[in-house]
Amino acid sequence: FEIPSFDLTELYKETELSNEDLSGNFLINVWASWCITCRVEHGFLEKLSKNGVRIVGLNYKDDRSDAIDWLKKYRDPYELVIHDFDGSLALDMGVTGAPETFLISNGKVIAHYRGEVNQMIWEDVFIRVIKDSEIIL
């Protein structure tokens, strides 16, 4: 499916964002400061980001200041963070909780995983699809 249309704000600057601001190949990671499993997977996301994987954060049903403080404490692996304060975009994407991760290629979801992404999941779910689709992150 395609990324649903949305009009939300960027977490830090509070500038308006829409699906038109997202292009190319990247991950969308659904996370929240209140999510314990998000903290568990965070180190792996940092590793991916340092290796050049583009990651957009979708901050899910979270208080803006709590989310910013959380990223300051644990570091920010995201190229961009969408503040989905009421969960509307997540709902439109079929999200049932956090964390969830989507692989996006040119506006379309080509892989999706519910739960913690770690090295094993990265290889089994995402790398396989990346190789099969011949996309470059």
Could you say what each language-model-derived stretch is?
Residues 1, 133-137:
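Non-globular targeting/processing and membrane-anchoring segments
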Residues 1-19:
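N-terminal "domain-start" segment that seeds a small globular fold
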Residues 5, 24, 52, 78-79:
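A generic structural signal for alpha->beta connector loops
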Residues 9, 36, 46, 110:
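Nucleotide phosphate-binding site architecture
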Residues 16-39, 45:
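Short active-site neighborhood of thiol/selenol oxidoreductases, capturing the structured segment around
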Residues 27-28, 55, 101:
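Hydrophobic beta-strand anchors of alpha/beta hydrolase catalytic cores
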Residues 39-75, 85-92:
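Structural microenvironment flanking redox-active thiols in thiol-disulfide oxidoreductases
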Residues 73-77, 84-130:
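Thiol/disulfide oxidoreductase modules built on the thioredoxin-like
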